[in-house]
Structures are given as C-alpha cells and as structure tokens.
Amino acid sequence: MTIKSLLPFIAVTFICGGSVLVEARQPKSPSAVVKPTAKPTVSQPVQPKWKLFTPPDGRFTILMPGNPNRETQYQKTYMGEINLEIFVAQPPKQQVAYIVTYNDFPYSYGEMSDPQAVLNDARDMALKTTQSNLISQRNIRSSNNHPGKEIEYINSGGKITKSRMYVAEGRLYQVMAITTKKQQKTLAKTITGYLNSFQIVLKK
C-alpha cells in the first residue's frame, strides 16, 4: 500500500440523511501473479520509531510511526466548501497504513447534528463503499468525553480496517489502521496502542 493508492479512496461523502462523512475506501487487491516456485527470503520488518504527532492546528495528538504525509482535499457541498485533512504514515516493509482524517462541519450544521447519527451513518457508509463485512463495533468516548464509535471490518480482498470515529466541537475525526489478515495478527497490540494514543485537544 502506498499513499498514492490510499488517498484517492478517502473522500468527503454525503448520504440521504444529509450527514457529511469521511469514508475510507480500500483499493482492490491486484490480481495474483504466478511466480516460479522458490524458497522465499524471510526478512524481519523494520521497527519504526514512534513519536507524538500534533497537526498544525493543534486540535489532536497521536503517536505515529514517523512523520505522516499530509493531503488536503476540497469538496463543494450544499453547505459550502468542505476541507478534508488527511495524515498517513506507513512503516517500511510493513503492509499497514495508519491514517487520521478530519473535516469540519459548518457551524450551524455542527450545532444541529446528532453525533450518534453521524457516527452510525459513517459506519454504514464505510461498510457499503468498501464492500466489507462488520467484524465488531462498540460505542466509545474520547478521554474528554466526546462520543465515538469503534468498528472493525474486512473487505473481500482480505484488508482489515480498525477505526475509531469521534464527533467533537463541530468536527468528525477518523483514526484508522488498515492492514492484511497476516499482519493484523502480529500488529494487533501496536494498532491498539496507536488508537489509544489519540487525544482530542479542545479549543481554548
């Protein structure tokens, strides 16, 4: 997985309820290539150096494996232009991507919207657009008591996504780890630690 292959599948999306959602769509797995039989070379993955990351606006902190790449996407909507900020970190020689995205709602919409409805719609849209099956879900709260939802799902290509979504101060955050079945087993504790490290910083 490369950042170029991931970014086109992350976008601001609307559904019939009018909610603005961040959807993470995973690319389809490439067709299998037949290779001559040979004993594979086993190489140990390079352990990344994790460090605390804070975005330019200072509204959250999270542990990331190195400096994430940043991408900004702009979407015109009936509420005006919505900016989607995307941060992606991918350790070398590991089939995993650590992603944080957020988008701000217009003030009036943020005041009126039901956080749980936004979270439920985000879950449904993620499953639909990635053609995935839900593995587990639970309602959660951020460390400063903002509503959230954790979901885990798998698509037909075997990619597993574990995501925590939060609605706070007119903003929808999504914190995700996308990996393969094989890597998920070895990275389960690392992914949990990554998700647990996410902290929302309230506006002053």
Describe the role of every protein-language-model region.
Residues 1-10:
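Bacterial N-terminal signal peptides that target proteins for export
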Residues 27-45:
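N-terminal, intrinsically disordered, polar/charged segments of Gram-positive cell-envelope systems
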Residues 10-17:
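Bacterial N-terminal signal peptides
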Residues 68-70, 117-130, 171-204:
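Surface-exposed amphipathic alpha-helical segments
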Residues 40-83, 142-145, 192-199, 204:
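N-terminal "mature-domain start" segment
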Residues 22-24:
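Boundary at the C-terminal end of the N-terminal hydrophobic targeting segment
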Residues 86-117, 173:
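A short acidic-to-branched-hydrophobic micro-motif
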Residues 63-89, 122-168:
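Signature of long, low-cysteine stretches enriched in small and polar/charged residues
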